[in-house]
């Protein structure tokens, strides 16, 4: 009986690993179908009890693997731009911009996962699939991300994604009007406006 139990446990583990691998492969394959796009989005943040913390909206431009522009317009404007090497974060309200090397930025965030779509990133997660929904749970428990969910169609269109942090705060993003196709290269460049304080952390 003990040998049977061990065999069943091993088979169960192998089946689970195969399912996770298939889900990761399907997710990457779907995202690979769209190399660049623009979409508007709405954001809703809730705390562990489900109470609303913040609602917002903005626009998103992506050209994989490393070019993106995340422009939050409400409730407070902020801009996150990657030119492929430098990651810029600009807060117009405080007139401050921060520059860091993209290679040093954490990949353990939903947006970075979507923008890069690299196999090495997806391998850090156990992934379960239910139709167009993919639920990702980090294999390592030392990060702030508890769970990441993304809904992406077979044509590569992202409909929504959400992230749950360790304190159960949930950030949900609904994408709409996704336009697949070439994006103006100017969207992936950033020059700090005159008078803005720059914190350059690339040194």
Swiss-Prot record:
Give one Pfam hit by family name: LolA
Q: How does it assemble?
A: Monomer.
The residue range of the signal peptide is 1-21
Q: What is its main location?
A: periplasm
A single GO cellular-component term on record: outer membrane-bounded periplasmic space
Record function comment: Participates in the translocation of lipoproteins from the inner membrane to the outer membrane. Only forms a complex with a lipoprotein if the residue after the N-terminal Cys is not an aspartate (The Asp acts as a targeting signal to indicate that the lipoprotein should stay in the inner membrane); the inner membrane retention signal functions at the release step.
CDD domains reported in the protein's UniProt record: LolA
Q: Which InterPro entries does the UniProt record give? A: LolA/LolB/LppX, OM_lipoprot_carrier_LolA-like, OM_lipoprot_carrier_LolA_Pbac
Q: What is this protein called?
A: Outer-membrane lipoprotein carrier protein
Keywords noted in UniProt: Chaperone, Periplasm, Protein transport, Signal, Transport
The listed outcome for residue 68 to E is: Loss of ability to bind lipoproteins
From which source organism is this entry?
A: Escherichia coli (strain K12)
What GO terms in the biological process aspect are recorded for it?
Answer: lipoprotein localization to outer membrane; lipoprotein transport
Out of the domains of life, which is the source? Bacteria
The UniProt family comment states:
Belongs to the LolA family.
Q: Which gene encodes it?
A: lolA
Compartments (UniProt record): Periplasm
């Amino acid at each position: 009986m003990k040998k049977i139990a061990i065999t069943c446990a091993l088979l169960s583990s192998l089946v689970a690993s195969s399912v996770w691998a298939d889900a990761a492969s399907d997710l990457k394959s779907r995202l690979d179908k769209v190399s660049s796009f623009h979409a508007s989005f709405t954001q809703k943040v809730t705390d562990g009890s489900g109470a609303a913390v913040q609602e917002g909206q903005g626009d998103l431009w992506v050209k994989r693997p490393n070019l993106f522009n995340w422009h939050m317009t409400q409730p407070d404007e902020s801009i996150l731009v990657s030119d492929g090497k430098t990651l810029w974060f600009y807060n117009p309200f405080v007139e401050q911009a921060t520059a860091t090397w993209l290679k040093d930025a954490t990949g353990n965030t939903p947006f970075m996962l979507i923008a890069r779509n690299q196999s090495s990133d997806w391998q850090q997660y156990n992934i379960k699939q239910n139709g167009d929904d993919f639920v990702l749970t980090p294999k390592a428990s030392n990060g702030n991300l508890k769970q990441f969910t993304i809904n992406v169609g077979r044509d590569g269109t992202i409909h929504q994604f959400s992230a749950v942090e360790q304190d159960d705060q949930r950030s949900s993003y609904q994408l709409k009007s996704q336009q697949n196709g070439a994006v103006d290269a100017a969207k992936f460049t950033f020059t700090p406006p005159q008078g803005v304080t720059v914190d350059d952390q690339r040194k």
